Amino acid sequence: MPDHLDPAPDALRPRWTRALEGSRSPGGPDPTPYADNLLTRWQEPQRRYHTLTHLTAVLDHIDVLEKHADTPDLVRLAAWFHDAVYLPNRSENEERSAHLAERALPEAGLTAPDTAEVARLVRLTVTHAPADDDRNGQVLCDADLAILAAPAPAYADYTKAVREEYAFVPAEAFREGRAAILRQLLDLPRLFRTPYGEREWEQRARENLRTELTQLGSAPG
């Protein structure tokens, strides 16, 4: 597990409320139960990387990138839901997270079109491949991938936490699978789609990916 504590849920609850209130008409249901349900999910014991620390980082990065989004509060809601369902040994986490958003958000007061947009954004995190005119998608995907551009110690914490989430995978199989993912990322013409992400994160992210790929080739497991 990374050598730091996750943020306190109380620090995140107001951020949920602001995003929800910014996306719905006044007078909707109390936001707190919805926040508490999501916060409980983000603190499940099987998580090592996909924790409140990751959620906070994605929200912080959306704050940096918000001018590039069409509806930044919907992007923030998508961040809350994008890993709300997370089991490392399952492949349908994003789809199940999108379904959760489709059930919860209309009850919380969002319109059908806005709910559909949040669910679409959640599903986009399967590929992290937003269209050139998908400003909301570009912001969410860049915010989610920004960890790739972290300073070396934080990136090392990230890779350690990912390995811990996949502790059930044998070392050799993990190395092969992780290396394939890193090569796929390095083969992309652009990791980041917003002007800010491309300018500030692209080069450092590629350096981190190349370093990890080299380490995977020589590490014993």
What are the language-model segments listed below?
Residues M1-S25, Q43-H50, H61-T71, F81, ...:
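Divalent metal-dependent phosphate-bond-processing catalytic cores, especially two-metal-ion Mg2+/Mn2+ enzymes
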Residues R13, T17, T32-D36, L59, ...:
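An amphipathic alpha-helix signature
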Residues P31-L39, L52, P72, R76, ...:
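Short, well-structured alpha-helical segments
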Residues R41, S97-A131, R183-L185:
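Histidine- and acidic-residue-rich, metal-dependent catalytic cores
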Residues E44-H54, Y86-A98, A112:
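Active-site metal-coordination segments of metallo-dependent hydrolases
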Residues V58, D73-P88, S97, V122-V126:
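His-Asp-centered metal-binding catalytic motifs of divalent-metal-dependent phosphohydrolases/nucleases
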Residues H68-L74, R90-N93, L110-D114:
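Short, flexible active-site-proximal loops enriched in glycine and acidic residues
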